[in-house]
Amino acid sequence: MTNGNQNTRFSWFIPIDGDGARAGTVRAERPPDFDYLRQVVQTAEDLDYYSLLIPTRFANGLFAEDAPLAETWTTATALAAVTKRIRFLIAVRPGFVALGLFAQMAAALHQISKGRIDINIVPGGIQNDFERVGEFTDQSTRYERAEEFIAACRKLW
């Protein structure tokens, strides 16, 4: 059987919450320490994956809330420094980080990765993540804010 679409790109996921050997794992069997995450990223790059999705969270969303969690931007920047080809799709939740700081972090990651970043705007997501940081806006308000965020980013870049 031949692949009819040679332009298909495959992506993977950086498990900033930790990881298990199979779906449905109750407790992280592999914590999200840098050595493990680097192994995941380098394996994906060796297998010619196109990109890696990195979520943005303020507490562990897969396992216990107090379980270890790797911070998105620091982790992505460190992993970009040890890879050559694979891209990083960073999930951004407008309102979690001030726009000016986001622009600086994205510019730094763009420079370190030599342009291998993409941005995934996530105005919805897990309500508890927003409430955890004192954000009680409804989803429609967050979608409006996402539109403003994107417009401001376009002006900055």
PLM regions: where:
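Short gly/ser-rich anion-binding loops that grip negatively charged ligand groups
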Residues: 62-69, 92-99, 139
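Short His-Asn-centered micro-motif
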Residues: 55, 91-92
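Hydrophobic residues within beta-strands of alpha/beta enzymes
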Residues: 52, 88, 117-119
